[in-house]
Regions:
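Sec-dependent bacterial lipoprotein signal peptides
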Residues: 1-20
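Residues within mature, well-folded domains
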Residues: 22-164
Length: 164
């Protein structure tokens, strides 16, 4: 028996609405120096991406894109204990993105985008993140424009969309 599309859409919307609530419960329980990698996986699930670090630690990306406005990077030491936890979609981190940075460098800094689009006529690969906005009636997006020829950052921009 096939489930009607509208029922699937309702369950997807409920899941998206509950995800931030899960973060509100789970994130305060993750404590650097105490929480184990197994506990993080149990509470948060599998990370969207894992970055290996030179010192043997690993950083796990817990991204809430495209609907959320946060991305948590949790660094696990070689002893399997949480070292740090940081919400990386911040004005300070967005300001660190510079011309020429690679896609990997950008992802490492602020996590994976909520959407991607290639504009051949502009020679750009566009990555977009939903970020915290000024008012609840607006959605704010941070955009990184990568040059298709070089692969590096060409520029950054923002756009604001009114909800409703």
């Amino acid at each position: 028996m096939k489930i009607p599309a509208w029922i699937s859409a309702v369950f997807a919307a409920i899941g998206a609405a509950l995800l931030p609530a899960c973060d509100a419960v789970n994130l305060p329980e993750i404590k650097p120096g105490i929480t184990t990698a197994a506990e993080v996986r149990s509470r948060m699930g599998n990370p969207a991406y894992e970055f290996g670090n030179d010192d043997g630690s690993v950083t796990w990306e817990y991204n809430r894109q495209p609907n959320g406005t946060s991305c948590y990077m949790i660094t696990i030491g070689s002893d399997q204990i949480v070292r740090t936890m940081e919400q990386v979609l911040t004005p300070a981190n967005l300001g660190k993105i510079r011309d020429g940075m690679s896609r990997d460098e950008v992802r490492r800094l602020i996590g994976g985008p909520g959407s991607k689009a290639v504009f051949d006529n502009l020679g750009e690969d566009i990555w977009e993140w939903r970020i915290a906005g000024v008012t609840p009636m607006e959605e704010t997006y941070f955009i990184v424009h990568f040059d298709l020829a070089s692969g590096g950052v060409k520029k950054t921009s923002q756009r604001v969309a009114t909800k409703g």
